[in-house]
Amino acid sequence: MKIGDLVFHWLTEQIGIVLEVRGDIGVHVLWTTQGRSLFGPGHKEWCCEKSIGLLTNYLTTA
């Protein structure tokens, strides 16, 4: 995963853009959709890399 990648959170069904990747912390994501989350577009969040996946991978397996 790298800066600028489009990602999908499997639990909240949010789509976002990777802002920063830090192995010791995780992935900083700017969410562009709300999905099932309480937080809307524009919210930034640090996520564990295991809880999100590349959107292109999700679209090819769905």
Predicted regions span which residues?
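Basic/aromatic-rich interaction segments and small domains that mediate binding to polyanionic partners
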Residues: K2-S51
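Long, low-complexity intrinsically disordered regions
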Residues: G53-A62
